[in-house]
Regions:
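Alpha-amylase-like alpha-glycosidases and glucanotransferases acting on alpha-linked glucans and related
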Residues: 1-130
Length: 132
C-alpha cells in the first residue's frame, strides 16, 4: 500500500487536498543524520542566497492519504520535528532559510523558528493596519 501527501480539510477547502507527492521516509533518513537533506539544502544554497521552505509545518506533522483515496480519509503523521533541525544545523547554514509558516502554526514550530532565528512570512492582505 502506498501513501501520498495532501492537506487536511479546512475552511478553505472542505474536501481537503490530495497533492500526490511521495512521502519522505523519515525513519530511514534519520539513520544517516538526514544526509539527503543536508546535501540537498547545501547544493541549493550554493546556487541561491536564501531558500524558502514551503509548508514548513510539515516537518512537525503532515497529512497522509492512501493512494487513490480522497483527502477526507487522510490522517496526521508526525514529522521529525526539532531533531531534524538540530542535526542539520551542524552542516547547513540555517540563517539562509525562510519558513513558509502561513495558516495554522503549531507552538513547537514557532519555538523552533525562534530558536534558529528562521524568519517566517507575512502576507500583506492578511495583516491588519495595526501590524503595518
Amino acid at each position: 500500500m502506498s501513501f501520498v501527501s495532501g492537506a487536511v480539510p479546512d475552511s478553505f477547502n472542505k474536501e481537503g487536498q490530495v497533492w500526490n507527492n511521495c512521502l519522505y521516509q523519515w525513519d530511514r533518513q534519520k539513520l544517516d543524520n538526514y544526509k539527503y537533506w543536508t546535501d540537498k539544502l547545501n547544493k541549493t544554497l550554493d546556487l541561491y542566497n536564501y531558500l524558502r521552505i514551503d509548508h514548513f509545518v510539515g516537518f512537525f506533522k503532515y497529512w497522509v492519504i492512501k493512494k487513490g483515496d480522497s483527502a477526507l480519509k487522510g490522517e496526521w503523521k508526525q514529522g521529525p520535528k526539532s531533531e531534524f533541525f538540530d542535526k542539520i544545523s551542524k552542516n547547513v547554514d540555517l540563517d539562509k532559510l525562510l519558513a513558509e509558516d502561513l495558516g495554522v502554526i503549531l507552538k513547537e514550530t514557532k519555538s523552533l523558528l525562534n530558536k534558529y532565528n528562521i524568519p517566517g512570512m507575512k502576507v500583506l492582505q492578511q495583516l491588519s493596519l495595526i501590524h503595518i
